[in-house]
Each structure stands twice: as structure tokens, then as C-alpha cells.
Amino acid sequence: MTKLIVICGATATGKSGLALNLAMRLGSVILSADSRQVYREFDIGTAKPTLAEQQLVPHYLIDVCTPTETMTVADYQQQAQALINSPLLPHSPAPLLLVGGTGLYIRSIVQGMKIPRVAPNPELRSQLESLGQSQLYGMLQQVDPVASHKIHANDCLRTLRALEVFYITGIPISEQQGEHPPDYPILQIGLDCDVEKLGLRIRKRTEQMLADGLVAEVEYLCKKYGLELPLLNTLGYQEIKQYLAGDISLDEAKELIVLHTRQFAKRQRTWFRAYPQIEWFDADDPDLLEKVWQPVQNFLDNSN
């Protein structure tokens, strides 16, 4: 019987580390729920699990498409559900672990979101992208105010997708969405910590990314794919791109990454806190693994 354990929360709360420890103890595999880790070559800036970590525990839904391709929530849902239902996935009787901070990815699985199956239209996207994010968001507010309330004004990818769905189908994306929860048992675990401690975690991780070669990664990606690649305008990459262009210093780029990541984490916390099914744990608890282990055991005992 399929059983799913979700580990979610804001960025830099230690989800991947907890998931690795749980997976090794349970004999489970990990399904990533991160909207940027699906792309190959975007490694350091997305905090993608290392090859060593992936050798310890099998990871899925990482490196599944090229940076020039588009992974929609519908694409992710389809691939994730196929894996969850696959008799070939080596997890039974252990539960699957769904791990990440992309709320829509997790919601698409846990709540069985009904998502419009609208293929990306490169020509339409190109026309829309030329208008700039500010104008695009204003357009979204006009054609789909419900979606605009759920999408941040700086979220280029989701704004673009919502407009794309509207202009192709003539129906707002918010009207095409519904929910059909799966019939298998699900345990949802959330990690959180004090805001100031989270800020320190974010700063430490940003410094580690820079030490691991983030600048070289961004430079390589800019040369290979061009400066206009949408992924290079996302968190951690856009700031280094500004540095490489000579617009800001490396220290300024670092501080911007920290600031923007803290802002992003705040939005993530707000998103996940809206779901009462999530059982929360302190990411800084030295006994975190054992604290989490108790509800995991209860979940497995009660779902057999």
C-alpha cells in the first residue's frame, strides 16, 4: 500500500538533511518537490542534493529537463503521480518521502489539484516576456484577479503561466483548478524556526554556495544559454548575473541574495502555515530526528 510522508517548510530549514536521515532509517526513496531542482545544470544555486547524497538515497524528480524546457505544475504532478503509482519504484513497504519547499508542487500531489493541461506556447511566451514583469502582472490583475492575489508580483514564471493559460483557453486559470485528494495515507511534516535564526541559516547557506562555486556556475550558464534565460532571473542567479555585469560588487550580490531569500522564506512560511494538516517541528531542535520519528512510527502503524 502506498504511503506518503511530506517534509516541507521554508528554504534553509534543513528539509533535505532530515529527509536523508529518515529515508536511510526507513529504506525509502525521495521525491523532490522543488521547482528549480528539476532543471539540469542549475545545481549550486538551487541547493540540489549532491551526487554523494543521491548515492546514499535514490532521488527522483531532479534533473528531469533542460534549462530551456518548461516544467509546469501540471507536468510535475503528472510525473510525480506516475512515480508514486509505479510498481517499479523500489520503496514498498517503506513510505515515499516528498521533500521540498515549492508549495504548489506539494499541493498538486497532497490535495490532488486539477490543473489545466495547456501546453506551453513559445511564440506567445516570447511576446509576453517582451512586455516586462510589471506590465504582465498588471494584465493578470485585469484578466484573473483571483490568481493575481495568489501570485507574488515578482513571480515571473507563475505570472507568465497564468496569462498563457488564459490567452490560450480564454478561461482564467483560477477557474480551471479544483482538488481531488488521493486515497492513500499522507503524513505532512513541516520544519520552521525563529525568524532571526532562519536569517542566520540563510546567510550561512548563501556563503557556502559562494564558496562552492556559485559565481562560476552562473558564469557558465550565462555563456551557454544566454542572459535572457528565465531561470537566470531567479533567486541567487539574478544577483550574481548583476555582479558579472559589473553593476554591483560580489559583497552586494551576497547581501541581495540573503535579503531576497529571507523575503522568499517569509512567503513560504505564510503559504505552508495555511495548511492545518501539517505537523510542525523546530528545525533547530538537537533531537529533531527523534522528535519526528514518533509521529512517523504512529503514522506507519495506523496506516498498515
PLM feature spans:
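Phosphate/pyrophosphate-binding catalytic cores of soluble transferases and nucleic-acid-acting enzymes
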Residues: 1-304
